[in-house]
Regions:
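Conserved nucleotide-sugar phosphate-binding/catalytic loop shared by glycosyltransferases and other
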Residues: 56-58
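PLP-dependent class I/II
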Residues: 2-5, 10-13, 23-27, 31, ...
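Conserved N-terminal alpha-helix of the aminotransferase class I/II PLP-enzyme fold
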Residues: 61-96
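Intrinsically disordered, tyrosine-centered linear signaling motifs in cytosolic regions
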Residues: 60-61, 204
């Protein structure tokens, strides 16, 4: 019998994020700091709206592009938060999480062989989605000495005549890096000069801890060449509701909608009604959760400093990315040893690209009690490793 599988799909590796999570779920007294999921419940008034929609029998398909009411609220949100104006009817669509939006944007925009510039370390979906869309990933290694920000010089160095899209993964998973206005201005100049398009993944836009998030789409001349992707999972603690959105020029959005129609039909109806409430009345919930995350962020950095573990200061998302290079182990070896010896699960930096070697991703989207216990065990681990090195 001939091989039933696509040669392309066989080149795609499973996500490295879930590997240690699956192991720790079967391990007694283990603590996972590996999954990027808020530990908060979805705020009650948002859940209540979802329940009410079910009680009212709102269980039918919505428009392929999403509920009109939700798209209107998304447009209002973008205007009040970032001063950006989008036509809810032509430039906004609701997706099954931000991940679907990434996938269909790439499929709608790429021809075979088109190059997509992907800064790494970054979210695990960008490379496989590019490959599955027929594109060619071109990796830019973000450097710790640049605060894991993308520089115009790094971008310029990898552009070729085949380059079509730049993915902007900021605030960044796994590093927590952000791009400030001055950083983006330099990138915008290069993008315009080379006539590139941008897919800006802004799922952590509400979780920034210095100033306010700046969207690359807000710069003059950039809205028409940017697909802005966001969602409800991180800011509103709605991961299981599976809801995101894409904002793009009508010419791009129409083609994204084709793929969405045939593959998905529409995003979950109940989730969309709940999201209307989140958009209307969720700002205070987001602010409270952001404040809590910021307290945890400061605590994690303080503890790393106490144990002498080098860690770049993250200003976005809810991750820390400490360096373990001093111990002479790979990221995977270090994460495995930490799990087996101290029952703490983290994610090797290499899950987010080869340039993540020498780092671990630690999520602080966990209770302070769990963080205190976990960091105590990590300190023991670090102390034992250093003692072992001294005895050699």
């Amino acid at each position: 019998m001939r091989d039933p599988l696509s040669s392309t799909i066989k080149t795609i590796q499973p996500s490295g994020i879930r590997k240690f999570f699956d192991i720790v779920s079967e391990m007694k007294d283990a603590i996972s700091l590996g999954v990027g999921e808020p530990d908060f419940d979805t705020p009650w008034h948002i859940r209540d709206e979802g329940i009410y929609s079910l009680e009212k029998g709102r269980t039918f398909y919505t428009s392929n592009a999403g509920l009109k009411e939700l798209k209107i609220e998304i447009a209002k949100y973008l205007d009040r938060r970032y001063g950006m104006t989008y036509d809810y009817n032509k430039e906004i669509m609701v997706t099954v999480g931000g991940s679907e939006a990434i996938d269909i944007a790439l499929r709608a925009m790429l021809d075979a062989g088109d190059e997509v510039i992907i800064p790494q370390p970054s979210y695990v979906s960008y490379v496989p989605c590019t490959v599955l869309a027929g594109g060619t990933p071109v990796i830019v290694e973000l450097k710790e000495e640049n605060d894991f920000r993308l520089t115009a010089e790094e971008l310029e160095a990898v552009i070729t005549p085949k380059t079509k899209i730049l993915i902007m993964p900021f605030p960044n998973n796994p590093t927590g890096a952000i791009m400030e206005k001055a950083d983006l201005e330099a990138i915008v100049q290069v993008v315009k000069e080379h006539d590139l398009f941008v897919i800006s993944d802004e799922i952590y836009s509400e979780l920034t801890y210095v100033d306010k998030h700046v969207s690359i789409a807000s710069f003059p001349g950039m809205k028409e060449r940017t697909v802005l992707i966001n969602g409800f999972s991180k800011a509103y603690a709605m991961t299981g509701w599976r809801l995101g959105y894409a904002c793009a020029p009508e010419t791009i959005l129409k083609q994204m909608l084709k793929i969405h129609q045939f593959a998905i039909m529409c995003a979950p109806t109940t989730s969309q009604y709940a999201a209307v409430e989140a958009m209307k009345n969720g700002d205070e919930d987001v602010a409270q959760m952001r404040e809590e995350y910021n307290g945890r962020r400061r605590y994690v950095l303080h503890r790393f400093k106490e144990m002498g573990l080098k860690c770049f200061e993250p200003f976005g998302a809810f991750y820390a990315f400490p360096s373990i290079k001093e111990f002479g182990m790979t990221s995977d070896e270090s994460a495995t040893k930490l799990l087996n010896s101290k029952k703490i699960a983290v994610v090797p930096g290499t899950a987010f690209g080869e340039c993540g070697e020498g780092f671990l991703r630690i999520s602080y989207a966990y209770s302070l009690d769990d963080l205190k216990e976990a960091l105590g065990r990590i300190e023991e681990f670090v102390t034992e490793l250093r003692a072992g090195m001294d005895n050699k």
